[in-house]
Amino acid sequence: MKLSTSLLAIVAVASTFIGNALSATTVPGCFAECIDKAAVAVNCAAGDIDCLQASSQFATIVSECVATSDCTALSPGSASDADSINKTFNILSGLGFIDEADAFSAADVPEERDLTGLGRVLPVEKRQNCPTRRGLCVTSGLTACRNHCRSCHRGDVGCVRCSNAQCTGFLGTTCTCINPCPRC
């Protein structure tokens, strides 16, 4: 059975409910360990994308591991974290869930989001649109994601009402600003 987008979405769902609580576990190290454990469980090498895609259990095992290991925070700076980040992104890009160029780019990717329904009240031109940042949650953690969103709101139109942020997408790798800030 081919590894489908809906099956892999299970992993994404588990990683998006990270809330405000942070643990000492490193995100890339934790995710990489879960990927390794799941690969062994389905008799695949962690880098064998074709084998992982063919497995019907890989995403379920990774999802359960992410949930039970509390893969929600980053302790940045160690060489093993850098190796784990590379390994995790290689797996995710190999499975087609992230574009390697986007993941390793520092450039913002503009994306209009209306998660609060302000579009019904205020026209788009009256709202500030903050770009998502791919890979930021893994490389720098939820705190950096929140800082990115606050900086976006303050820098674009001088708005001081800080928006919240969350790590979304597959394995929570994308920083998404929520609660769009009306122009001040």
From Swiss-Prot:
Source taxon at top rank: Eukaryota
A GO BP annotation: defense response to bacterium
Residues of the signal peptide: 1-23
Temperature dependence: Optimum temperature is 4-90 degrees Celsius.
pH note: Optimum pH is 1-8.
Keyword entries, A-Z: Antibiotic, Antimicrobial, Cleavage on pair of basic residues, Defensin, Disulfide bond, Lipid-binding, Membrane, Pyrrolidone carboxylic acid, Secreted, Signal, Target cell membrane, Target membrane
PTM notes: Contains a unique connectivity of 6 cysteine bonds in contrast to most other CS-alpha-beta defensins which are linked by 3 or 4 disulfide bonds.
GO cellular component terms, A-Z: extracellular region; membrane; other organism cell membrane
Pfam families in alphabetical order: Defensin_5
One term of GO molecular function: lipid binding
Localisation: Secreted; Target cell membrane
Pyrrolidone carboxylic acid modification, residue list: 128
Propeptide boundaries: 24-127
Disulfide bonding pattern of the chain: 130-159, 137-167, 145-175, 149-177, 152-184, 162-181
Function: Antimicrobial peptide that acts against Gram-positive bacteria (Listeria spp., Enterococcus spp., B.subtilis, B.anthracis, P.aeruginosa). Is not active against Gram-negative bacteria. It selectively inhibits peptidoglycan biosynthesis through complex formation with the cell wall precursor lipid II (1:1 molar ratio), probably anchoring lipid II to the membrane, thus inhibiting cell wall synthesis. The interaction with lipid II involves the third position of the pentapeptide.
Family, similarity comment: Belongs to the invertebrate defensin family.
Protein name per the record: Fungal defensin copsin
